[in-house]
Amino acid sequence: MNIRSIITAALALLVSTACLGGVKQQKVMNNNGKALVVFFSHAGDNYSVGNIKVGNTKIVADYITELAGADQFEIVTHKYDGMAYQPLCDLAKEEQRKGELPPYEGSVDVSKYDTVFIGGPVWWGTYPQVMFTFFSKVDLNGKTVIPFTTHEGSGLGLCVRDVRKAYPKANVTGQFSIYGHDVRDGKARVEKWLKTLDY
């Protein structure tokens, strides 16, 4: 290797490091193991999009399931069925204040999955309490956990923090958020995000 090649390689390394801003970048690698998408989604009366038959988060979860070739488990509770938006907000706030853990239907065996996408709407700054019920029952420590959210201005809120608190030994990374009113035209955005994770 001549001196010009060495200098060129050194400059390339310097530029790539500068672009990272000195922050260690953590990339989620698809190891061809099966992934699981776990989510809670609320249909019915929703902020910004009105009364919808399919919840915003379910639409995103379906995109991920299709594009990543993943399996899917929906956290289903009927506690919020038929509720208008404002009463639901009030109930969600009260559940959060009390630390309630509403029950949900069914169960899932996560032992065969290395990667779990976990998503929901952002209610009062974090995931709905029924998702914390899932966190309390299902151990995802040792796995790669990828949070995603739908929202109307909260972004990821405290969801990533709360997933890390629930699973301190998981690799919580690769998070994604999207406005609820954008999800119906958001498949390309989800696909672009998944490509950054090698899916």
Report each predicted region and the residues it spans.
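Bacterial N-terminal signal peptides
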Residues: T8-T17
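A charged, well-structured terminal subsegment
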Residues: N171-Y199
